[in-house]
A protein has these predicted regions:
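Transmembrane signal-anchor hairpin modules in multi-pass inner-membrane enzymes, especially those
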Residues: 1-92, 100, 121-131, 135, ...
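Residue-level detector of secondary-structure boundary/capping sites
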Residues: 15, 33, 97, 109-110, ...
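Alpha-helical transmembrane segments of multi-pass inner-membrane proteins
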Residues: 22-23, 111-118, 131-163, 170-239
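Residue-level signal for alpha-helical context at structural boundaries
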Residues: 42, 56, 151-152, 164
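Interfacial juxtamembrane loops and adjacent helix segments
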Residues: 85-93, 158-166
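Short aromatic-rich membrane-water interface segments that cap or initiate transmembrane helices
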Residues: 92-107, 165-178
């Protein structure tokens, strides 16, 4: 009985660790992120099935499923047989560009639908802790911000990746996605800070975090993430 309880706790701990460390996988690259995602989903489904956890699909879930099916079908028709929409006779096998395999790329998107449903179930069971995710996001986004700033002033980041003339990607190397990463995870960082830090001088540290991320976004060379960041900050403070 004790072994079963310990095994259950270990499974929960594994799921929690995998969930909270997603920001780290984003930095590590697409391959590790994909592996991380698959392990998390499989571990979560195995736990849900083992514990006989049931859940009811709500309207929002059905809308999400319909959206993914619609996107999958439209993408498949558009890339595999574009003439089908104009009523042309299509040689389905011969016209499919298997070298690019967009149907498989489209099908892979379904994993995010499964991820959303799994996270919903685990969150309703109070297995996932968002505060820990916020904290890891704060650490990761702050690290990327500091690395981008270091690269801007020194020509290379701490991993010896060189920056371009007008772009600084920090730990992402040749992929110019530092701005996109900071824009997405900066809000999780700010939410994490607001949720975890309730001490004196809170506003000073909050301003420091915002300025740090904003400056890193500015020198990363990604203009749209910078605009979205300021728009998000504006909406955050007026809501």
């Amino acid at each position: 009985m004790i072994n079963l309880k310990n095994q259950k706790l270990n499974q929960i701990k594994l799921i929690q660790i995998l969930f909270c460390t997603f920001p780290i996988s984003f930095i590590a690259g697409n391959l590790l992120l994909s592996i991380h995602l698959v392990i998390f989903v499989i571990s979560s489904i195995f736990y849900i099935k083992k514990e006989n956890i049931t859940f009811k699909l709500e309207i929002a879930h059905w809308l999400l499923i319909i959206f993914f099916i619609y996107t999958f079908l439209i993408t498949t028709i558009q890339f595999q047989a574009p003439g089908f929409l104009q009523g042309k006779n299509i040689n389905w096998v011969g016209s499919w560009p298997f070298e690019s395999k967009p149907i498989f790329k489209s099908f892979i998107l379904i994993r995010y639908l499964i991820l959303a449903l799994v996270v919903h179930v685990l969150f309703t069971q109070k297995i996932l802790d968002l505060k820990k995710l916020f904290l890891v996001s704060l650490i990761c986004s702050s690290f990327v911000s500091l690395d981008v700033i270091f690269q801007y002033y020194n020509g290379v980041d701490i991993f010896n990746f060189k920056g371009a003339v007008d772009r600084n990607s920090g730990p992402f190397g040749d992929e110019n996605i530092a701005g996109s990463f900071l824009q997405k995870f900066s809000f999780l960082s700010i939410f994490g800070f607001l949720a975890l830090y309730n001490k004196k001088h809170k506003n000073i540290f909050l301003i420091f975090i915002i300025v740090l991320h904003a400056y890193a976004l500015l020198i990363s060379g990604n203009r749209m993430p910078l605009i979205l960041f300021f728009l998000g900050i504006f909406l955050l403070f007026i809501i």
